[in-house]
């Protein structure tokens, strides 16, 4: 059976995530005790408070530490992916699973990424909304109308995540995003809901973060990819010769094509998805996109269900 690992992004995190794995599995505990991130991943993850964990510069290393730990637990059980993908931040966990990044490397790297993303948005009032019940092209068209209205102001609202059919996020400056919500509702969107993130991620406002990542990547070693990773900004695996560093630099400031990524993995023969991370957001996206099962691994008790699905 061909298995695809899917790694969660920001938004579903909660204080206490991973504590049951920490108590039950030494390989998971090792990740939380010995990582070299500048932030205290263990304390923030297990004790919070929410305000601390919700800060992007803290959320990112905590989420990736959780993902790395669970990946190691699954490997110990003999469960390894044939392909991997991740939503936004989750792409870094997917690259860890594929052998491109080491555990020692990836957690400090995403702490740097989180900080760079926060700094890119500093001084701007930003917002992200989830647009429910609207097609891709209509959302793009609505954002184009808003861009014309706000031309010359420097304010933007751009499609950020194409999560699954009927759910797309729009991100940017708060004023422009509020206007986009009005325009998209007038055009037939069922709802526009606020999303819990602290910056205009996956829009052109993140270019300064992309620039910082490019500089950081120059001093990073990228390992050989052991399994295919399906990239957010491509909606498919990379071609030979395409640089992972360039793709990741672009990823932070480009739309995420998660729906296309899921379809691509199924086309490549994936018969079971495993969602790694808090919550079950990606499982819902899979359910709405393809007819392939997805088992979430958020708590130790989820492992039984996964073993059953594989056997």
Predicted regions and their residues:
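Non-catalytic positions within long, well-ordered alpha-helices that form the structural scaffold/packing
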Residues: 75, 185, 266-267
């Amino acid at each position: 059976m061909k298995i695809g690992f899917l790694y969660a992004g920001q938004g579903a995190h909660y204080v206490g995530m991973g504590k049951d794995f920490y108590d039950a599995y030494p390989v998971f505990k090792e990740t939380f005790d010995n990582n070299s991130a500048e932030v205290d991943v263990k304390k923030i993850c297990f004790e919070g408070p929410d305000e601390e964990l919700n800060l992007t510069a803290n959320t990112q290393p905590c989420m990736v530490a959780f993902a790395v730990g669970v990946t190691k637990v699954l490997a110990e059980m003999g469960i390894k992916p044939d392909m991997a993908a991740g939503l936004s931040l989750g792409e870094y966990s997917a690259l860890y699973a594929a052998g491109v990044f080491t555990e020692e490397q990836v957690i400090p790297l995403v702490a740097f990424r989180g900080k760079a993303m926060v700094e890119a948005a500093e001084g701007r009032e930003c917002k992200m909304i989830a647009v429910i019940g609207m097609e891709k092209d209509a959302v793009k068209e609505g954002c184009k109308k808003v861009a014309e209205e706000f031309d010359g102001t420097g304010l933007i609202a751009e499609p950020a995540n194409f999560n699954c059919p009927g759910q797309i996020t729009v991100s940017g400056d708060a004023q422009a995003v509020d206007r986009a919500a009005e325009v998209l509702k007038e055009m037939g969107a069922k709802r526009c809901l606020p999303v819990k993130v602290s910056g205009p991620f996956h829009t052109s406002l993140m270019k300064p973060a992309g620039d910082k990542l490019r500089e950081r990547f120059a001093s990073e070693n990228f390992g050989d990819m052991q399994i295919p990773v399906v990239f957010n900004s491509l909606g498919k695996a990379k071609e030979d010769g395409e640089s992972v560093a360039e793709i990741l630099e672009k990823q932070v400031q480009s739309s995420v094509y998660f729906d296309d990524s899921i379809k691509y993995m199924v086309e490549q023969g994936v018969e079971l998805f495993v969602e790694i991370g808090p919550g079950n957001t990606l499982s819902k996206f899979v359910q709405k996109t393809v007819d392939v099962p997805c088992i979430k691994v958020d708590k130790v008790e989820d492992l039984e269900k996964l073993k059953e699905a594989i056997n």
